[in-house]
Amino acid sequence: MNQEHTNLLSLSEYCTLISKKTNMPYLDKENNVYIFDTLIDANEFIKTAADTTVSDKEILKPSFFITYMYGLGAENVCVKKGDKEDFITIPVDKADTKKDFFNPSANRNLLRLLQTGDKKYLRNLKEDIFLCPVKIDKRQAKKYSSIHYACAKLKDDKKFYLLFTTLDEFNKWNEAQGKNCLPLEVNMIKESQIRRNNPVIINPLSNKVILNDRYLKLILKKE
């Protein structure tokens, strides 16, 4: 991220366009997020973007903000200041985002799925990577270690397998549950072998997405 972009973000207060469906930054079909110099401009814009609102104005911390937007799956930040419109392209240099396991593709598809309900974003999840919580029993008399996949039980005692898009989401759940699990990277094909016919919850402590057997089979369906 160059000095021009740093100044653009840090020298003014901005409000961010928020999706009412996710309570997170709104991501459009071109994978842009939007920030505004004035509430007047923001309120005019939301008339053209359904189910959106705006955050309070704040001075953004450029590195943190860009990292966060990268993790959500944004490819550009559109900065609107009156009649002027600037675009900051994401991803930026690795040093700016401190890429860990942000998984922007999966987050992007989930945000767009929640915002639009369009099943193409559901099918896109087939190519994405997730974190699955596991416990590993150390070998004793057995030749191989045993892997146990953590599950959640909701009402009616039904079993749900768990997936997370980021280490932050995984750690939040792991600490809340006191599970002391480890994260295992899986894709939807591997997860289908793990879950058998049970449903899956993605990111249960934030904007959770529940996928039943029908939706999971739709994800894996060949084109």
Q: Where are the model-predicted features located?
A:
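An interfacial alpha-helical scaffold signature
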Residues: 1-223
